[in-house]
Amino acid sequence: MQLTVWTYEGPPHVGAMRIATGMEGLHYVLHAPQGDTYADLLFTMIERRNKRPPVTYTTFAARDLGRDTAELFMTAARDAYARFQPQAMIVGASCTGSLIQDDPGGLAKSLGFPIPVIAIDLPAYQRKENWGAAETFYQLVRALAGPNAPAPGTKRPERAAGVRPSCNLLGPTALGFRHRDDITEITGLLGKLGIDVNVVAPMGSTPADIARLGDADFNVVMYPEIAGQAASWLHRIFHQPFTKTVPIGVSATRDFIQEVTALAGIDPAPMLQASSSRLPWYSHSVDSTYLTNKRVFIFGDATHAIAAARIASEELGFKVVGLGSYSREFGRELREAAKRYDVEPLITDDYLEVEAKVAELHPELVLGTQMERHIAKRLGVPCAVISAPVHVQDFPARYAPQMGFEGANVIFDTWVHPLMMGLEEHLLTMFKDDFEFKDGAMPSHLGTGHAAPVAEAVAAPAAAVATESVATGVAAPDIASATAVAAAAAVWAPEAEKELQKIPFFVRGKARRNTERFANENGVATITVETLYDAKAHFAR
């Protein structure tokens, strides 16, 4: 067990909640203590849904453990059915509720409801949120679509002449990163190709819709973490092929078009010729030359991280210096992707490891989750969010897909805006020594004040501590300690500061830190140009 202040994924029952919340006509009865009801806030506060998730908690408390908690669950299930009248019900236990071992599935089936009741048994202490979502969706598909499966050995009938091909879109859930807009984008893309969408699941579907998944000609797996297992089962039982390409980025979208048209038996050429993304031209234009070889670190779920690495390398000309994911189930795919960019894959759910890797690699842009946004802010590196988990600002009111050609436009804007443009960088270099625009100058609208010299700034904290100590009677060792710390900090000579400014801005901070460390270790009080180059030689060994 590991204590942490952040986790990339919640427990698996949160994944089950994401499936239930995205659907209509499905209710989830969760055997859980009072404290586990926090999960509602994920959907109402972060995703800003206008209604609570369709989840009933048994909310047992410590005083209930001496009584029959099984009866408490059965009462909650009866009340939920009577109140909500769902088309189907899933039942399970939270991570804490599973310790009681009350068998929610058996208890619910004993109640004899006239609707499908699906038990979701999730190993709370071995698996996490995305696995829980995938397992829940898989169990729903098996239970609801299974009765309509053809007999074993039966061949899939050919599509009638004149009937448009159809497919299912599998994988979008509640609390997913831009899932709502991705559905709209891919549905529109398929419509232009002449392909109908039979069912979108789980988001927006009902149990009755899940039951007719087998009517489609093939399946589009939008998010393999969620839909991969269910799509494999549908392929095995209903003989429905499914797509392997996730259409994030221009190149991937073109590959996706070729894949779905091959499955549907139609010509992809007209759509490929009419592709409307601005990303290729924008990234090739002269104004974008400053993007070339920008060092980028990427971390997120496997689907978005792998797609982001391809876009960064092939479409924007970035140099991928780090690639990682918290999706351990997709470790093989991530390692294969990392080989293409000659980087060491980082597969971890410990945000401290991610922060250490970012600090080590010194990227110029970080692409990640909400946590990488915090990490990049602490390290002073530009950042863009590409993957869940995300906070409220990444559920925008506007249309902002990640998939398809419009998604590529959104990605270009999102990734490029945090960066310093090439012209801006050149102007800063040209005017860095100007009396008005140099780093030490005060903003012009604040008057004619001047920044304090470096030596004065270093000495000031010690003087302030000494003054306060005399006034308050703090012991002399504290004063001596503060003075010693101030004295230990090396002072930069003006010519050394000027030389430091010649170092590119994205490694200037590292050069400053290394030089100050070298000076402190060698007892150098004033950093000169010679000290700067001695430090460079020392750390280059």
Curated annotation (Swiss-Prot):
It comes from the Bacteria. Its EC number is 1.3.7.7. The active site is at D287 (proton donor). Its cofactor is [4Fe-4S] cluster. It catalyses: chlorophyllide a + oxidized 2[4Fe-4S]-[ferredoxin] + 2 ADP + 2 phosphate = protochlorophyllide a + reduced 2[4Fe-4S]-[ferredoxin] + 2 ATP + 2 H2O. Binds 1 [4Fe-4S] cluster per heterodimer. The cluster is bound at the heterodimer interface by residues from both subunits. Substrate binds at G422, L423. Pathway: Porphyrin-containing compound metabolism; bacteriochlorophyll biosynthesis (light-independent). Gene3D superfamilies: 1.20.89.20, Nitrogenase molybdenum iron protein domain, Proto-chlorophyllide reductase 57 kD subunit B. GO terms for biological process: light-independent bacteriochlorophyll biosynthetic process; photosynthesis, dark reaction. Component of the dark-operative protochlorophyllide reductase (DPOR) that uses Mg-ATP and reduced ferredoxin to reduce ring D of protochlorophyllide (Pchlide) to form chlorophyllide a (Chlide). This reaction is light-independent. The NB-protein (BchN-BchB) is the catalytic component of the complex. Belongs to the ChlB/BchB/BchZ family. Protochlorophyllide reductase is composed of three subunits; BchL, BchN and BchB. Forms a heterotetramer of two BchB and two BchN subunits. This is Light-independent protochlorophyllide reductase subunit B. It comes from Rhodopseudomonas palustris (strain HaA2).
